[in-house]
Amino acid sequence: MALTKAEMSEHLFEKLGLSKRDAKDLVELFFEEVRRALENGEQVKLSGFGNFDLRDKNQRPGRNPKTGEDIPITARRVVTFRPGQKLKSRVENASPKGE
């Protein structure tokens, strides 16, 4: 199961005593700041969590898997995420669900 923005808002409501509306606004504001920074070409560094980076990918040759036809894959900018060491360690040491 995936963690959703609604669940994050609910956790803030329960743990910090924020109103549901304020909790939802806080989550939305956080993600809007991350989006804005990336749109402006900035790296997003979240200490203890990881980094969101932008990478420019060049045009490259590709192939349509249905027809086998050669097609160019256009140049584009992509977002990458690199987890920080603390996050990696916590994930590696966590027990899988169901155990």
Swiss-Prot record:
SUPFAM superfamilies: IHF-like DNA-binding proteins (SSF47729). Gene3D superfamilies: IHF-like DNA-binding proteins. One of its GO terms (cellular component) is cytosol. Pfam families: Bac_DNA_binding (PF00216). InterPro entries: Hist_DNA-bd, Histone-like_DNA-bd_CS, IHF-like_DNA-bd_dom_sf, IHF_alpha. It comes from the Bacteria. Belongs to the bacterial histone-like protein family. This protein is one of the two subunits of integration host factor, a specific DNA-binding protein that functions in genetic recombination as well as in transcriptional and translational control. This is Integration host factor subunit alpha. The lineage of its organism: Bacteria, Pseudomonadati, Pseudomonadota, Gammaproteobacteria, Enterobacterales. The gene is ihfA.
